[in-house]
């Protein structure tokens, strides 16, 4: 057997914002609350200060995607379990009986350089990518949560990336595999893995970096003529070594991607509009400017041409990128937070009405992170907790057209005199945008895993209640969506000022057969006998009828709500 070296280059384009954290900067907590500023979570950087996506991060995402595909399809398609072990290396689970050393991976995933054209640096970093800020909402008070303000450096959607993976198959002539050790992969196994990786990327099964539940990190194959190239060479001979070191990197190899269809995800698409306008404001950049510009992000008085001018600098909507030409965006994290807050409210209302002893009537003193950990069980299954990841992903919603803009001005009243308060004139720049659909995805495998873990059931247990609990979680989410369709759940900011109203026109649910849920195609027809919220509730009753009662719940609990108890 001789050594064969491969090099795979895949040309990608970001289909959503991409963030992968490097070394976190230390927050100076000695400063007072009013003097504190956010510390951005930035990409890892090379020695020249350029942001990059580390090969370790990409390799972990690819390995997890391959492992999940094998669990779903077995060894009939793509590499087998043994072949994956040969390719990715040992994971340290062979036990103490083997005297052979752990085998390193045959796959090397190289660092992905991020495109930085047009971006400038600051005092700390040579190149700085755009950042997006967000904050968690206190579930009890409805205000911004303390110690829950986040700022992430990100690469905008639509940027091209080049992913390079090299591999080595076989052993040099005369070298034998130690007894009991895992043999290195052969050329056939390497090419089979590369076909699977290309197929996973092509079918949208791979996401890089963090904030994936907010829809970040998704990539797609480039539209270029040759989205991927695979070359190989045998460097054991002089001719093979020259071939490998040439500009071409060896002989070209044809590889057909594996068909990885069937995402294992339930998809909910909501067609909607907003009669009042949606605003998630772009925060003001940190800088040395104080005084007049200090509150510009909130629409407070800004710089004026004349000292006595009453003009304000309006709060402007957040866009999908740093350019003015980028579309207005309703972040997936914002929608997801609104859905979670309402789901928590519904679940806690039911638990209090049933006088569940594990639910306290007063939880006003809990911090926002503690609130997430104490959320009812079905909420944690869907949205995650401080311990495990949730099953629900909400993608960024882009405006298909900005539409005309208008400046909305308002002022605060003096609570003592009843007149206009001095220096408290605010304004927002609101666009009458036409929006794309809100898209929610539920990872059914993750939901079932969370449900079984919450019930304390091991994987593969017969007579599992995990599927019933998963359907119960869908029922809870369905109630939240019914409230959204009824117009009682505003999105974005300024909801108490009349903004953020949502008018749902249609809702489609697909891919729920794994939970025994049929596809839905519901529309809000004018003059119809049943409104869209009632149609949603009707579908939820059908789902609830197939849910067996949780045996851990006490008397008086039935159907989906019984799974709010006992975990």
What does each model-found stretch correspond to?
Residues 1-567:
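Small/polar/charged residue-enriched interaction surfaces, especially the RNA/DNA-contacting tracks
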